[in-house]
Amino acid sequence: MDGRSRCDSQRRGFAMYDLPDELPDVALEAGTNLLIAGPPLTGKRDVAFEVLAAGSRADEGSIVVTTKDSADKVLKEYASFVPNMDSVDIGVVDCVTKQRGVGNVRDDPRVKYASSPVDMTGIGIKLSEFLEEFYQVREHERNRILLHSVSTLLMYSDLQTVFRFLHVFTGRVQSADGLGVYVIDSTAHDDQTMNTLKQLFDAVVEVSDDGDGKTSLETAGFPKVE
C-alpha cells in the first residue's frame, strides 16, 4: 500500500473522517484513499455507500463518480442510506448515460456527464469542477469521493492507463484533503493487477460472504485501535 501513510491517527490541523459502524472504530486522516475489494454480490457497494453516508449525515460533501450505473440509479439507491436525501449535498459524475445514447442530457447542480468510462480526461475534468465547486461555492471543507467501479475502467482500458488515471485521481483527493473510496471486483482481475493497483491506496477493505449470506470484512492499513 501507499507509503504516504495517510492513515495517521494524529493528523495536525484537520479533523479526521469518521467511518460507519461496519468498519473499525477508527477515523481516517484527510487525504486517505480507501479501496473496497471483493467478489460480486458481497455488498461492496453498500459498504462504500455507508462510508459516503457517514459523511452526508455529518453535513460533509459527497461526490460519486459512476462508471457502472446512471446518475439517476445512483441517487435513487443512495437515498436509502441517508435520512433525508433533499438535505444531502451530493454531486455525481455520470460516465454511463451519454455512452448509452440517452437523449440530450446536460449538466445540472447534481449531475455532470462524461462521455464514457473511456473518457478519463473528461472524468477528471468533471471531478475537478465538482471539487472546486464544493470547496469554493458550497463551502464544504470536508468531502468524500466515491469511484464505482474501478473494474469497469479496466473493462475498457489497459492496466497502465487505469493506473495512471488512478494515480492522478488519488493525488487529487489527497491534495483536496478529501476521503477517497474506490470499489473493485477482486475476482475479475488477476493477482498482478490487484497488487499493482493496491499500491495506490492507503487502506484496503476486503469484503466476502461468510457462507451464511452475511458480509464479512477484513481490513489492512488502518490505524491501530488503542
Q: What would you call each of these model-derived segments?
A:
Residues 1-15:
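Short, Lys/Arg-enriched N-terminal segments with co-localized hydrophobic residues
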Residues 13-79:
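Glycine-rich P-loop/Walker A and Walker A-like loops and their local beta1-loop-alpha1 context
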Residues 42, 78-117:
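Nucleotide-state-sensitive switch-loop elements of NTP-binding domains
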